[in-house]
């Protein structure tokens, strides 16, 4: 049987969820003629920020 090795979670990859507004949300984005836009009505649950609820769509 091979010996066990210890792995460190902080090396190479850090698991977890980042806030949408910190990674992808860009309110200053200007649309282009080639963009395809879609609209959804989203009502966040109590305690959920609107941009996080929108990110789930």
UniProtKB/Swiss-Prot annotation:
Cell compartments where the protein resides: Plastid, Chloroplast
Primary localization class, coarse: plastid
UniProt keyword terms in alphabetical order: Acetylation, Calvin cycle, Carbon dioxide fixation, Chloroplast, Lyase, Methylation, Monooxygenase, Oxidoreductase, Photorespiration, Photosynthesis, Plastid
GO terms of biological process kind: photorespiration; reductive pentose-phosphate cycle
Catalysed conversion reaction: 2 (2R)-3-phosphoglycerate + 2 H(+) = D-ribulose 1,5-bisphosphate + CO2 + H2O; D-ribulose 1,5-bisphosphate + O2 = 2-phosphoglycolate + (2R)-3-phosphoglycerate + 2 H(+)
Any one annotated GO CC term: chloroplast
Residues where N6,N6,N6-trimethyllysine is found: 14
One Pfam family linked to the record: RuBisCO_large_N
Catalytic activity, EC: 4.1.1.39
Modified residues (N-acetylproline): 3
Main EC class the enzyme belongs to: lyase
GO molecular function terms attached to this record: monooxygenase activity; ribulose-bisphosphate carboxylase activity
Prosegment location in residue numbers: 1-2
Remarks, miscellaneous: The basic functional RuBisCO is composed of a large chain homodimer in a 'head-to-tail' conformation. In form I RuBisCO this homodimer is arranged in a barrel-like tetramer with the small subunits forming a tetrameric 'cap' on each end of the 'barrel'.
Subunit structure of this chain's protein: Heterohexadecamer of 8 large chains and 8 small chains.
Role this protein plays: RuBisCO catalyzes two reactions: the carboxylation of D-ribulose 1,5-bisphosphate, the primary event in carbon dioxide fixation, as well as the oxidative fragmentation of the pentose substrate in the photorespiration process. Both reactions occur simultaneously and in competition at the same active site.
Family assignment from sequence similarity: Belongs to the RuBisCO large chain family. Type I subfamily.
UniProt-recorded name of the protein: Ribulose bisphosphate carboxylase large chain
Originating organism: Buxus sempervirens
């Amino acid at each position: 049987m091979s010996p066990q090795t210890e792995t460190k979670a902080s090396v190479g990859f850090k698991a977890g969820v980042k806030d949408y507004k910190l990674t992808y949300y860009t309110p200053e984005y200007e649309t282009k003629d080639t963009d395809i836009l879609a609209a959804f009505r989203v009502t966040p649950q109590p305690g959920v920020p609107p941009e996080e609820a929108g990110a789930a769509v």
